[in-house]
């Protein structure tokens, strides 16, 4: 009995001691483990751990980080937000229009590229009075000259001060109500929802196009290092994962990178890239990691990630606590291959969509501001964080992913089963009676629109059809073929020329193929591009070969959204080129679709009697002349404007089942395609 009482007393004493320990130390442990929960609707930055004073007590005075003594102060106007410091009433007419203050004195090549990218965009205006946003370049990287206060400053209201480098220009005037678009701003000075975080751009960053992502195999190859650590002097060093302390103490094997000779330009050759969060200069390594397909691992970052307002960086980067090196390394080693694959794919998409050129960075900045202006009509997160990205998914067309051709598969939907035929009638201006009857006979045709582009008067009579026929007169430019007419009521467009010659069966089969590939162009006659070594440029041929990269728009199916891109996204110079050289319009339209989809067009067969001819050729069966080739410099001018060559070659042609098979004709659905 006494033994039992002693055990009970001992158990009570242990319980009381444990309870006292919990009461005394529990609150401190909670403060150590959990950051405060953000209030609903409040902006959320990087985690701010509450135990900094506890951790510093374990360090020697010389080991404390230098930049931890005096955090950067918020800029003047820190109380500004979008509602109080920006007047959206100036943007109600034409949306976002940007005026750039002219530079004074000598400017750097980077600033010259910025000016060129804005002046060639749909946002630019020559008049400050008609501008919704006034842009001021703050600091010249080469000359170090600072901008002075402009005449229309108005306390900075509706102004955007652009800083390309983390080190700010010494201020000769107060920012007031101006927004700041700065490279790698610190989390203490950044105003969420008002300022815009930019990437740290190198001086030699290309104006347009840019180099593609360097990831060639999404699954890590055997022997490739798991970790790469950025260095203060530039370059990367790979980590031997056998030593868990290697990434933090510098004992790593040097890796020059694939095919690189200059250390400062070396791209990391690893699966994960460890990037310090203390030094703003480390942000310059962030873009290198994205381009290389190396998953960025940010160690307690103190700078805002670029475009964090719209880009979901949890899908492409990892934020880790630098105080837990062993746990971070173990977590990276145990990460599933599926997760690694998803992160690496997202790095390549983000690099190509928003960061590969100066033009994309500037246009992304303006799109972020335009989304704030539109409010409820802004891009949803899916459009920003899924290919092809918000720059190619114009919110002026729609903000619903279901309306864009490249999101059908992701949304589990498919386009409607009807199309609109758009027939371009140029000189000599004869009504395409047979073509209208053939197209109207399709069970999928919803309407026919005839674009009359001729000096001759309109015919008084048109053929009677089972579908509505609308004639639009007065459009003389070739680019008017690709205008987003409000009368087009279907997703699919069948673009035709008055000289086209197609049968109803050909139209039906081509449309069914397009329904399976709504983001691509489906056509009958193809052409291809090639690199001409002799002339040092791109060439174009309409000869029948085993490969093709373009289809003629004189007989092709595509989604109506590409009319919106053609009219509202292309630079005016390219549309003028299409009007002055009509044969260039096919190349230009194929460039647009290829740049969006990263895929080649699809070829479908046409009747046997037309195998040696183009469907745009006039007349009846028999040999017909080949379509005229574009001007020699056409494809090169378009490629220069895009900054790269988006066209891709294909060897695929889709035929109906049983096409030309030795079976009964009665068993074939599209038997007319094989008739002589």
UniProtKB/Swiss-Prot annotation:
Glycosites: 269
TM regions (residue ranges): 10-30
Region (Disordered): 238-264, 610-631
GO biological process: heparan sulfate proteoglycan biosynthetic process; protein glycosylation; skeletal system development
Subcellular locations according to the entry: Endoplasmic reticulum membrane
Disulfide-bond pairs as recorded: 584-634
Family: Belongs to the glycosyltransferase 47 family.
Name of the protein this chain belongs to: Exostosin-like 1
Native source species: Homo sapiens (Human)
């Amino acid at each position: 009995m006494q033994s039992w009482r002693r055990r009970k007393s001992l158990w009570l004493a242990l319980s009381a001691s444990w309870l006292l320990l919990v009461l005394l130390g529990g609150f401190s442990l909670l403060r150590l483990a959990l950051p405060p929960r953000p209030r609903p609707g409040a902006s959320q930055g990087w985690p701010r751990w509450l135990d900094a004073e506890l951790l510093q007590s374990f360090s020697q005075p010389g080991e404390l980080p230098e930049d931890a003594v005096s955090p950067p102060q918020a800029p003047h106007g820190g109380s500004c937000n979008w509602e109080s410091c920006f007047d959206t009433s100036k943007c109600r007419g034409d949306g976002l229009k940007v005026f750039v203050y002219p530079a004074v004195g000598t400017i750097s090549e980077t600033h010259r590229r910025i000016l060129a990218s804005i002046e060639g965009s749909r946002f630019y205006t020559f008049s400050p009075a008609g501008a919704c946003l006034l842009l001021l370049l703050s600091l010249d990287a080469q000359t170090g000259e600072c901008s002075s206060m402009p005449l229309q400053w108005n306390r900075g209201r509706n102004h955007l001060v652009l800083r390309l480098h983390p080190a700010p220009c010494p201020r000769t005037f107060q920012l007031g109500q101006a927004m700041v678009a700065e490279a790698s701003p610190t989390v203490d000075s950044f105003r969420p929802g008002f300022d815009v975080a930019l990437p740290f751009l190198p001086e030699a960053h290309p104006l347009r196009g840019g180099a593609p992502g360097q990831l060639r195999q999404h699954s890590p190859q055997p022997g490739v290092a798991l970790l790469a650590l950025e260095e203060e002097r530039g370059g990367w060093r790979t980590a031997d994962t056998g030593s868990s302390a290697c990434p933090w103490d510098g004992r790593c094997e040097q890796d020059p990178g694939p095919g690189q000779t200059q250390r400062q330009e070396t791209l990391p050759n690893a699966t994960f890239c460890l990037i310090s969060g203390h030094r703003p200069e480390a942000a310059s390594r962030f873009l290198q990691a994205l381009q290389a397909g190396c998953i960025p691992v940010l160690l307690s970052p103190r700078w805002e990630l670029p475009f964090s307002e719209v880009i979901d960086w949890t899908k492409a980067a990892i934020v880790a606590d630098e105080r837990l090196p062993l746990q971070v390394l173990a977590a990276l080693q145990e990460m599933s291959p599926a997760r690694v694959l998803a992160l690496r794919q997202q790095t390549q998409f983000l690099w190509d969509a928003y960061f590969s050129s100066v033009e994309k960075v500037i246009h992304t900045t303006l799109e972020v501001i335009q989304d704030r202006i539109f409010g409820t009509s802004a891009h949803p997160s899916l459009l920003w964080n899924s290919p092809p990205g918000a720059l190619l998914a114009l919110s002026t067309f729609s903000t619903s992913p279901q309306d864009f051709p490249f999101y059908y598969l992701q949304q589990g939907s498919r386009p409607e089963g009807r199309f609109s035929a758009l027939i371009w009638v140029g000189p000599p201006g004869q009504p395409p009676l047979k073509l209208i009857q053939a197209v109207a006979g399709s069970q999928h045709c919803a309407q026919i629109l005839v674009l009359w582009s001729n000096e001759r008067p309109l015919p008084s009579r048109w053929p009677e059809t089972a579908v509505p026929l609308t004639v639009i007169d007065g459009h003389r430019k070739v680019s008017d073929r690709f205008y987003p007419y409000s009368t087009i009521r279907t997703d699919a467009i069948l673009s035709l020329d008055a000289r086209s010659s197609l049968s109803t069966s050909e139209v039906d089969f081509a449309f069914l193929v397009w329904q399976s590939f709504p983001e691509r162009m489906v056509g009958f006659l193809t052409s291809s591009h090639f690199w001409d070594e002799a002339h040092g440029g791109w060439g174009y041929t309409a000869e029948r070969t085993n490969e093709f990269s373009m289809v003629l728009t004189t007989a092709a199916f595509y989604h109506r959204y590409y009319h919106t891109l053609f009219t509202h996204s292309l630079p005016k110079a390219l549309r003028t080129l299409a009007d002055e050289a009509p044969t260039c319009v096919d190349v230009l339209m194929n460039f647009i679709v290829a740049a969006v989809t990263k895929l080649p067009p699809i070829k479908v067969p046409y009747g046997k009697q037309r195998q040696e001819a183009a469907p745009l050729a006039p007349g009846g069966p028999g040999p017909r002349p080949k379509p005229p080739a574009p001007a020699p410099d056409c494809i090169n001018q378009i490629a220069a404007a895009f900054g790269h060559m988006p066209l891709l070659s294909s060897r695929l042609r889709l035929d109906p089942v049983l096409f030309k098979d030795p079976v009964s004709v009665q068993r074939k659905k599209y038997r007319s395609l094989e008739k002589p």
